């Protein structure tokens, strides 16, 4: 019983406080303190928690997060979303359900630049939903398309979630994680487009008129600076010209230039509000990271990963079954916990387990983030689901049924990425990671 006491206290206190509605940062910190106090005296436990809080934030890599958050907020206010939508409409062409395809492609592009699924759902839903309804699309279907596709950009770099995973996994290469996310992210987007197209054909949704050559040229020309930004950031990181942290600073400078000078969608007077939004978001994320470092130490000190591995081995010694169980657990976790805290808390638990099975940490990072992408679209706590419904002004219960085909295809892609490592590992290995 003494051996299990720190673990029981840690998770018992954590989930009890979550059930009471205690903010997750406090739930993590207090449950960690209580768990460590079962092994050390209170003052020593308090010292460990405070040291881990400070050391967890003492990382040059972490500087990328506030810069990418600021860059995303500038994009959200700077008219970039509208230009990406116009570009996506050209790519969608006259396919059945073209506006749904446009929504998915625009979310992939905007999410890849901003790194925020919530921002993508809000920005794209605000523009695309009224257009789709006007063209005769079912409002619930339109919302489901927006919600399901918003997280695709979290796999397509740059991604704050992959940066967080790199930190908590012990320094997995960020460039390798960025490379590994491309194919799964694009595969997920294409799979969603297939489902949207099938539904559009069955329901007889109209095809848009073919754009004139001039309209296509203008849309592509106006989107080139935003597309070039993705190429600049990723090309610089992968070529070694600059680090991910330096890339994030370049992203801020570039988006400021686009929004203030080129597109002129915001003025200098709008910047304090954007900076304040970014500071608040950054503070929340960094508090979560710092407090989670103490929890990770408490779990490692109590040998939680090895206990989990022993438990899974008693169920089955088949890696396929063990990975299936881990995916099911992560999917359940994703339904009630936001992405960043879930990655911070459960990576230290499951990463040692999967590495024992021979799974590459880069591969597992993509699997974990893909699980969380599904989770944030799922009730009861899915943040993207709530934002998507608030934008379209529809209750969540109206969206669940239209979401079911998209959930199915997302789980199918998850299974493919889990059991076919080449999907995520081909690019990193080809470039020497």
Residue ranges and their predicted role:
Residues 1-433:
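Alpha-helical transmembrane segments of multi-pass membrane transport proteins
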